[in-house]
Amino acid sequence: MDTLNVELGTRSYPILIDAGLIGRPDVFRQHLGAHDVLIVSDTTVAPLYLPALTASLAPRRIVEVILPDGEAHKTLANAARVLDVLIANRFGRDCALIALGGGVVGDLTGFAAACYQRGVALAQVPTTLLAQVDSAVGGKTAVNHPGGKNLIGAFHQPVLVVTDTRTLATLPARELRAGLAEVIKYGLICDAALFGWLEAHLDELLAGAPAALAHVIRRSCEIKAAIVGRDEREVGERALLNLGHTFGHALESATGYKEWLHGEAVGAGLSMAAAMSRECGLLAGDEAARVRRLLERAGLPTRIAAVTPAAVLEHMSVDKKVLGGRLRLVLLRAIGDAFLTADYPAPALARTLAAHCG
């Protein structure tokens, strides 16, 4: 079993990575004690992994909430549903919430854990590649709003992340490709060697090779854990993890969270960020082409025809990185060298949107 740590002083926590962890009672006993547990999952994941998880957690009192699957259900109403169950079952402040699922379940459950009695323990058990490499780590929790993605949320770190790599064996190919977008992002922001490794080993990843997947999960978590440890609240370096996400979140919200998986929208957003970096004279043309080729090989969209540039720009205007009325973007100087800036020419953004939308 691989163990990484997110170093946050007294709130530090482990990321455990191995096959079969959901079925190991010792993993949960060590970190959750004997407290009451509320498990939140969805209609896709629960039939596959909920029985094994509940068996590992016995003999605690366990209550379950099963949500519909999909980004469209990451809502304040469903978070309220989780809170209603906690209150109805008289859960105390010593309870724990466990998120069993992908990014939607993890974000929503984390938000409920942050809200309930001003914060209770949270364990993340991510079952998708995207959640395992990104959303389960770092303490960002949120629900969506019709006006924008993740506009309602809180920072609330888990006490434990249990990454059972065996869950990837049941992951649909589309979900696997979506998760690779976040892995590609890590290479782009700070690890050119990882990006080169992805170019060389992408076929293994797409085929679901366990060793290749374990490698990218560990490396992605190493990068994110280090960044979160240095900048938990995203006042500086952590903003780099949003490469492609300002574009991607706008694409998701502009299409009502129904058209694209989050990772697919991020893939298109990474293509747009690379293209805009080239438009601004920052990123060499051959490197921008490498980014686009890798995204295309991964089966990720590099443009979105179903939404207009004006609609995307409107949704970008409510992004959380807007400061003083100015939209900040994460751009690239090179593969492995990202930076946050509000100093870019508006025509470059307009050309980028026109080339990738509509």
Residue ranges and their predicted role:
Residues 16, 111-204:
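A glycine/threonine-rich phosphate-anchoring loop and its flanking beta-alpha core
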Residues 197-310:
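Active-site segments that bind and position negatively charged phosphate/pyrophosphate groups
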Residues 1-96:
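ATP/NTP phosphate-donor binding region
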Residues 7, 31-32, 90-92, 115-117, ...:
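Solvent-exposed alpha-helices and their adjacent loops that cap or buttress functional pockets
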Residues 2-4, 181-183, 282-358:
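C-terminal charged capping/lid subdomain of soluble metabolic enzymes
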Residues 104-111, 132-133, 249-250:
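Short glycine/serine/threonine-rich phosphate/pyrophosphate-binding segments
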Residues 108-119, 254-255, 275:
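Alpha-helix C-terminal capping segments
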